[in-house]
Regions:
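Short coil/linker segments at helix-helix boundaries
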Residues: 49-82
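Canonical tetratricopeptide repeat
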Residues: 8, 42, 100, 134, ...
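TPR alpha-solenoid repeat register
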Residues: 5, 39, 97, 131, ...
C-alpha cells in the first residue's frame, strides 16, 4: 500500500540526496504507523545525511577575512539520536541503529559515548568490521594505541584492508 510506496520513494530520494523530500515521505508513514521501524530508521538517516550535507556546504562557504571560526554553526543531532533511540525502543537489538548512533556521537565530539556505543554494537554482532574500524580510530584519537591496534587489526581481518595502513601510520610506538 501507501507505506511501501512511501518507503521506496523515500529511499530513492535519499539516494538522490533529496533529503527534505525523503524526510517528508518517511514522516508521512510515521503519521499513520508511528512504530514503523524502517521509516523511523530511514528518517533518522535522512536527517543525519542532511545535516552532514549542510555542514559540508557550510565548510565550503567563503568567509569574510578575519571572521571568527567560532561563527561556524554547530549541528544539533538530537533529532537524529532521538530517531535511533526510537528504533531501539521498538527493537533493542537493532544493531544498525546503534552503529549509526555511535557515529553520530563521534561526529558530535562525544568520544567516550561513541566508544561505549560501539562496544554495545560489537556485543550484539562481533563481525561488524566498520564498528571495529571506527572504534579503532576513536582509540587513536584518545591516544590508546594498543586498543586501536587491536580494533584495526580485527577490522582488517574482517575485510577493511585500509585498516592496516592506519595501523602502520598511527599505531607504531614512537
Amino acid at each position: 500500500g501507501d507505506t511501501d510506496a512511501y518507503l521506496i520513494r523515500g529511499s530513492i530520494y535519499l539516494n538522490q540526496k533529496e533529503y527534505a523530500k525523503a524526510i517528508e515521505d518517511f514522516s508521512a508513514i510515521l503519521e499513520k504507523e508511528p512504530d514503523n521501524l524502517l521509516a523511523l530508521f530511514n528518517l533518522a538517516n535522512a536527517r543525519m545525511l542532511m545535516f552532514d550535507y549542510i555542514e559540508s556546504v557550510d565548510d565550503k562557504t567563503p568567509r569574510i577575512v578575519g571572521e571568527q571560526q567560532q561563527m561556524q554553526r554547530k549541528i544539533d543531532y538530537s533529532q537524529v539520536i532521538e530517531g535511533y533511540n526510537e528504533c531501539l525502543r521498538i527493537d533493542s537489538d537493532f544493531v544498525f541503529a546503534l552503529f549509526n548512533m555511535a557515529n553520530v556521537y563521534a561526529k558530535n565530539g562525544e568520544i567516550e559515548r561513541a566508544i561505549e556505543t560501539f562496544n554495545q554494537v560489537l556485543r550484539l554482532d562481533k563481525d561488524i568490521a566498520e564498528a571495529y574500524f571506527n572504534r579503532g580510530l576513536l582509540y587513536i584519537y584518545t591516544g590508546q594505541k594498543a586498543l586501536a591496534n587491536a580494533d584495526l587489526s580485527k577490522a582488517g581481518e574482517l575485510g577493511i584492508v585500509s585498516a592496516y595502513n592506519v595501523i602502520k601510520r598511527y599505531c607504531k610506538e614512537n
